[in-house]
Amino acid sequence: MSILAAERQQRILERLGRDGRVLAASLAEAFATSEDTIRRDLRDLAGRGLCRRVYGGALPVSPASSSAQIRAGEATDRKAALGQALAGLITPDSLLFMDSGSTNLAAVKAFPDDLRLTVATHDPAIAAALLAKRQVTLWLIGGRVDARIGAALGGRTLADIEALRPELALLGVCALDPVAGVAAFDPEDAEIKRALLRNSSRVAAAILNEKLETSAPFVIGQAESLDYVILEADASDSVARAFADRGTTVLRAQPAEAD
């Protein structure tokens, strides 16, 4: 790699960190070079895990590729606020599907103790937390449990989920962008999430700021396939408008009050 190319790629990364996305055409104009050269730069950066290529440019890589155990201990107060907002969408006496994810686990803690509900999940940690909710009827979807995802995956799991018609699905999201859509890091996890999009009357996803305007390898659906997106209180207004322009209802989680 020439010094010029190395410097250009560093500046591309700086723009990506500042703006949340880069477009090949704009970069070519800014650096007075060809789009082919920029595309080669983006391929090289993506190959080193420094960005994720999308049509026309690149997005940052989502930070959500760590294990379920690690994710459960991160940003707990912020996830609690998102979980509270998710819990407010639930219709009593309905079928709710809870996808895997530490933010969805936080939502369980926000359920009122007297909430009457049937909940299906393939996430053992969520199922264990639901046992404390005496008015909840729990359906645990089985299959091979993937330790990194923290949930059952595979053909048996998918078949059982395909047979359900939830009134609401709380989707666990690895990466979300208004243009690039919803994405995941595991192909089997992505297939389960696609089934939830197809079969649920309503779908909601709550997302931390650092997962916004990022991408992951396996596309689940377009942003407009989500009925609700719950953002943090300080999430970008422009991102919120971009989701709303696509017909998605945008809610903001209220931060937890300090003791």
Task: Report the location of each language-model feature.
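A generic "binding-loop/recognition-motif" signal
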Residues: S102-T103, I126
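Conserved phosphate- and dinucleotide-binding cores of soluble alpha/beta proteins
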Residues: S2-L27, A32, G47, A125-D259
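HTH-adjacent hinge/linker in prokaryotic transcriptional regulators
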Residues: M1-S102, V108-R116, A120, L131-Q135
